[in-house]
């Protein structure tokens, strides 16, 4: 059987060669009488008929160039022809496409004169790049980790050195590690390498919080800061370029300078940390001492006999002596000896203004933290059925108490009050957090154990509107007597509770069940009960009259028409399953978050040091909110400039933008277009944007981009710029560790080859942004490098390094080019985008 097949293949190949030879001999004999046929379509290739051409097109080989760069084995499998016939076809395609031939250097130079160049908006930067961003090339841009995205010096951070939790200002942290003698000058500031420091980082897409390494701590001086005050009393003091995670129709990173009152800044509901062991009785005693203890004499004063008995008993067990108890006017003062002072440490000499949360409590588990807070509440807290209030004169202690509450998943409110010249910090807990606080009340010795439920919800109206927009895609039963239904279907500007969110979650689960039932009915050939209007399938080519008929009478009888209707309904079911799953994922994510409304935003004079932690893996750390470094200003400017006519530095073309980190901002495009003399609405219409959610999706979008490029090729606005921002984000997130490096680089090489092919075949400019990572062995010079390794380094035609310069300027350095010398250019970011 195998021999028979082999003979058949040989006969088939021989026939194909004979057919090709006949064509060649005929064309040879007729050369003098007939002009040589020009190959412009697949059917013009020798041995390619309509059926073979259709197979090739279905597989994506729809141009002469695509055939020319294919392998014989690929065509053999796709078209069902022999390898020899495939080779003949490829050779003909290469001759027609002029691929695989050599030319003299002077001819090649003439060909390069056809390369287009897009102005960056800056003459200095254009000169550095040899006239602008070139077509038929990949230009890579990456930036430093400082870039003006930092925190004010008094910003509190928490981190772990090995396994020990530290809680201090970012300035104190910097000086602690700089004192080890490893500070290095970097650009306009300084950087200190970190070896054993870990922080917790947040993935906005999944809601996952994980422990990760910090590589450097960096500082520089700035003149201005943004002060963002939140409705719960929190104050963020950060540089204007610093991205802040907000909820705007979904999670987005927005520069601090673009935050407005009413925006919702997103934080983490429960802050994680490594936990050490501490006895609950010790934690409770420390809470009492921080609340009511004094240093001179070293003692605790209380009016509660129960608390007095606990303190005496604890000291007897812990320190081996019975403390002296003085009774004055109904108050008990318990006096401690030197042995107690020794283990209390600095707390034994502190006063009301200098007290802090002890380090052993910062490192404790949730149960011990609850015991400490219970001790503090019993000592100096205020509690009713509807509110919890903790007051202190110490700013450090207030910050520490907030941190401990966040460890338990409680987000308190903060306010300040000045009494007789002294500032007091008031921390209070209301709303749904009161229920969570009951885990503290369980440890209390003198306070009641239950609080009222309900109150103001923790979920904002913006979340309800976002979910309501998704819910409007369905047609489900009305529920006018339910709050959840009103949140989704009416414009109600109210915060809602966990109970309401859970009911909304049930609606979307019901939608998924009904979609599944409809799918099963269609597969059985029955008329389905749809959880969406029948009119939804008009988008698939059906008329309103047809849809009305199907809704009334059921699926059509004619098999071919029935198949089309079923196919359209299944497509709509699949789409709506994605909508319902997005809603459920959003709900699950919202449960891990806190939403803080912005009360005010003010730009203030600062003229001091700002600091930043460098987290190479994820570019953000928890408390304060995240940090993600982007190099998108130049990309936005190019997306506008490419649309200008050639005499004004453009190519009169359209743009494709693949967005991997949700950084494309149409508002910025409109601003640049207006200031460059272009119609902002028309400018937006010429930009095609797609969000990539993983590396496979990113690579698929490059294939889809080719379809748009072909479609627009003969129009008055052909695609001339393809932006990928950023190139490596998904590859880094999905391929973690050395064990996956080879697979990642192989996949990246394929991705870059596809981008190069688009640039060459269609004469477009490919512009990619990249991230940086720390070089752990760098003690001098630039302590960062772009990610992507040698694969990206050798694939990018030009590589440009961006850094922050003086007086708000930016510096671009050309570090790799096949034909241009290294050099630098200085430019600014303004309303026009990039300019001199």
UniProtKB/Swiss-Prot annotation:
GO terms for molecular function: ATP binding; ATP-dependent DNA damage sensor activity; damaged DNA binding; endonuclease activity. Residues 15-41 are annotated as: Disordered. It comes from the Archaea. Residues 15-24 have a biased composition (Acidic residues). Pfam families: HHH_5 (PF14520), Intein_splicing (PF14890), LAGLIDADG_3 (PF14528), Rad51 (PF08423). The keyword tRNA processing does not apply. This protein undergoes a protein self splicing that involves a post-translational excision of the intervening region (intein) followed by peptide ligation. Residues 285-410 form the DOD-type homing endonuclease domain. InterPro entries: DNA_recomb/repair_Rad51_C (IPR013632), DNA_recomb/repair_RadA (IPR011938), DNA_repair_Rad51/TF_NusA_a-hlx (IPR010995), Hint_dom_C (IPR003586), Hint_dom_N (IPR003587), Hint_dom_sf (IPR036844), Hlx-hairpin-Hlx_DNA-bd_motif (IPR003583), Homing_endonucl (IPR027434). Keywords: ATP-binding, Autocatalytic cleavage, DNA damage, DNA recombination, DNA-binding, Endonuclease, Hydrolase, Intron homing, Nuclease, Nucleotide-binding, Protein splicing. Residues 31-41 have a biased composition (Basic and acidic residues). One of its GO terms (biological process) is intron homing. The intein interrupts the ATP-binding site. Involved in DNA repair and in homologous recombination. Binds and assemble on single-stranded DNA to form a nucleoprotein filament. Hydrolyzes ATP in a ssDNA-dependent manner and promotes DNA strand exchange between homologous DNA molecules. Belongs to the eukaryotic RecA-like protein family. This is DNA repair and recombination protein RadA. The gene is radA.
């Amino acid at each position: 059987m195998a021999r028979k097949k082999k003979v058949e293949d040989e006969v088939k190949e021989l026939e194909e060669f004979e057919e090709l030879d006949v064509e060649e001999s005929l064309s040879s004999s007729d050369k003098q009488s007939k002009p040589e046929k020009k190959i412009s379509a697949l059917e013009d290739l020798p041995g390619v008929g309509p059926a073979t051409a259709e197979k090739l097109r279905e597989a994506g080989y729809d141009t002469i160039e695509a055939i020319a760069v294919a392998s014989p084995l690929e065509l053999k499998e796709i078209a069902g022809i022999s390898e020899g016939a495939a080779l003949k076809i490829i050779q003909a395609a290469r001759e027609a496409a002029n691929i695989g031939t050599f030319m003299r250097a002077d001819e090649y130079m003439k060909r390069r004169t056809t390369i287009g160049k897009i102005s960056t908006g800056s003459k200095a930067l254009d000169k550095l790049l040899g006239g602008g961003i070139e077509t038929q090339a990949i230009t890579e841009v990456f930036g430093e980790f400082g870039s003006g995205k930092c925190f004010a010096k008094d910003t509190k951070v928490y981190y772990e050195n090995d396994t020990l939790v530290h809680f201090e200002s970012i300035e104190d942290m910097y000086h602690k590690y700089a004192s080890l003698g490893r500070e290095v000058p970097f650009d306009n500031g300084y950087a200190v390498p970190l070896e054993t420091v870990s922080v917790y980082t947040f993935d906005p897409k999944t809601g996952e919080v994980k422990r990760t390494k910090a590589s450097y701590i960096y500082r520089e001086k700035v003149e201005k800061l943004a002060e963002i005050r939140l409705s719960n009393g929190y104050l963020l003091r950060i540089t204007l370029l610093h991205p802040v995670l907000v909820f705007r129709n979904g999670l987005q990173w927005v520069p601090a300078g673009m935050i407005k009152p009413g925006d919702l800044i997103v934080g983490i509901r429960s802050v994680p940390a490594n936990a050490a062991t501490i006895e609950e009785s010790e934690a409770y005693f420390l809470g009492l001492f921080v609340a009511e203890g004094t240093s001179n004499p070293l003692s605790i004063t209380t009016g509660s006999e129960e608390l007095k008995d606990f303190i005496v008993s604890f000291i007897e067990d812990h320190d081996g002596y019975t403390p002296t108890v003085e009774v004055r006017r109904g108050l008990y003062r318990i006096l401690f000896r030197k042995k107690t002072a020794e283990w209390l440490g600095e707390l034994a000499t502190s006063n009301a203004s200098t007290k802090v949360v002890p380090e052993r409590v910062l490192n404790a588990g949730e149960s011990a933290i609850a015991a400490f807070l219970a001790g503090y509440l019993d000592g100096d807290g205020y509690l009713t059925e509807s509110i919890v209030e903790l007051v202190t004169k110490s700013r450090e202690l207030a910050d520490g108490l907030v941190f401990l509450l966040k460890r338990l998943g409680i987000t308190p409110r903060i306010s300040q009050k000045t009494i007789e010249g002294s500032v007091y910090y008031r921390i209070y807990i209301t709303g749904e957090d009161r229920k969570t606080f009951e885990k503290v009340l369980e440890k209390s010795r003198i306070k009641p154990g239950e609080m009222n439920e309900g109150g103001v919800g923790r979920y904002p109206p913006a979340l309800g509107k976002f979910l309501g927009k998704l819910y409007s895609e369905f047609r489900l039963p009305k529920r006018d007597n339910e709050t959840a239904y009103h949140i989704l279907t009416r414009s109600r500007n109210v915060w809602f509770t966990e109970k309401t969110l859970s009911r909304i979650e049930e609606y979307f689960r019901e939608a998924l069940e009904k979609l599944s039932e409809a799918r099963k009915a269609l597969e059985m050939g029955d008329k389905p009960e749809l959880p969406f209007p029948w009119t939804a399938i008009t988008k698939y080519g059906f008329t309103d009259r047809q849809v009305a008929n199907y809704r009334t009478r059921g699926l059509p009888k004619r098999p071919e028409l029935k198949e089309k209707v079923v196919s359209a309904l299944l497509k709509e079911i699949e789409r709506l399953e994605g909508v319902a799953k997005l809603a459920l994922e959003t709900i699950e994510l919202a449960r891990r978050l806190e939403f803080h409304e912005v009360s005010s935003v003010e730009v203030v004079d600062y003229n001091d040091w700002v600091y930043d932690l460098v987290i190479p893996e994820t570019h953000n750390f928890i408390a304060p909110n995240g940090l993600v470094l982007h190099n998108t200003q130049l990309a936005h400017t190019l997306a506008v400039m490419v649309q200008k006519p050639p005499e004004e530095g453009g190519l009169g073309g359209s743009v494709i933008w693949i967005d991997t980190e949700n950084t494309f901002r149409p508002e910025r495009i409109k601003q640049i277009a207006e200031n460059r003399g272009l119609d902002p609405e028309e400018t937006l219409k010429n930009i095609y944007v797609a969000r990539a959610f993983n590396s496979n999706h990113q690579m698929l979008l490059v294939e889809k981009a080719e379809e748009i490029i072909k479609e627009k090729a003969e129009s008055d606005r052909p695609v001339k710029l393809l932006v990928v921002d950023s190139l490596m984000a998904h590859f880094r997130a999905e391929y973690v560790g050395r064990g996956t490096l080879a697979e990642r680089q192989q996949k990246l090489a394929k991705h870059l080859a596809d981008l190069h092919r688009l640039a060459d075949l269609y004469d477009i400019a490919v512009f990619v942004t990249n991230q940086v990572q720390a070089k752990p062995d760098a003690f001098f010079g630039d302590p960062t490098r772009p990610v992507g390794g040698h694969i990206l380094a050798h694939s990018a035609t030009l590589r440009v390094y961006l850094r922050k310069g003086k007086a708000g300027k930016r510096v671009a350095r050309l570090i790799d080019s096949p034909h241009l010398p290294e050099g630098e250019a200085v430019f600014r970011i303004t309303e026009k985008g990039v300019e001199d």
